[in-house]
Amino acid sequence: DGLSDLLFTAGTMANSILSKEGAELQNTYMVGNIIIDTLRHNYSRFSRPTLLDDKKIKDGDYYVLTVNRKALLSDEAYLLSMLTTLNNSVNGKYIIAPLRGVAKEKISNMCQRMTNILVVDSMGYLEFGYLTSHAKGIITDSGNIAEEATFNNIPCITLNDYTEHIETITKGTNLLFGYYVEKIEMALGY
């Protein structure tokens, strides 16, 4: 940021951080948040995934799980412990995990006997947007998905000990859990 002549931000929190870092605010422009702008623009176009009807799952009666970070996927002992805890903590509700690639392969293998976790193919934007905006809660390692959850007022657990999206924490919709499996179990009991 210190090397740039012009700075473009997504909100007042980013402006505040830049100000604290000594940026010249006359060269800082708040242009909006493209993630949220895209969400707003497409909300009426969201498409209910057929999986929900096939499994007779009602809106607000399931969780969504996304996992993509290599560090999380490479720690197989933690990953298995986390998945087992999730499976045992959702009171019979489904956890829908739209995954791809290595994440899908690893988690599918680990979840073969876990009846509450449904590992499915990754979804397009409109289906995934519907899925996350109608979930009971979201478990993710993605800051962008946590940000969308905050916009949709959906409770979110972030499987990390930091986030670039501080507003998700200050609004109260997102909890940072890092690698603490026991916290996940407590949070899903809400």
Question: Which stretches of residues belong to each language-model region?
Answer:
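Nucleotide-activated sugar donor-binding and catalytic core shared by glycosyltransferases
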Residues: 1-93, 102-190
